Amino acid sequence: GIELSTARYFTQATLAFMLVGYVVGIIAIPKYMTQATALKICSWLGIVFTIGAVLTSGFVSVAFIALLGLANSLMWPAIFPLAIDGLGKFTKIGSALLIMAIAGGAILPLVYGWLSELTSSQQAYWLMVPCYLFILFFAVKGHKIGKTA
């Protein structure tokens, strides 16, 4: 395994990567890229880093997990405005439903735990790939469904 003296810094690295993502988002959105573009980039990063975490081992695998902080940094700040855009008088209801949807995120850790017991904690990360693929779909096409140009 990885020495505790090294492993203890991975949480800090994850938070640092997330902070970098926040700062990039503050600087780049909307001046240099749209929220949809940021979400596309972060979705791809999530897919790549997750696959990297599963297919590598040791320090490199854990580093990919830490890099997920960067991939996840702009997810919610991009999903929320894209989802409520154009809702008009239903914006309050749409916002409330999005906030309640956070509870759905509480289900995946349970599924991950179950998969970890069946396979391994590393292989259970495959669960995240379809999630990131769905977010990518939302960034590319899903947020446009039902909206007029």
Feature annotation, model-predicted:
Residues 14-20, 102-104:
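Short hydrophobic/small-residue motifs within alpha-helical transmembrane segments
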Residues 129-149:
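Multi-pass alpha-helical transporter architecture, strongest
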Residues 37-52:
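Structural signature of the two symmetry-related core transmembrane helices
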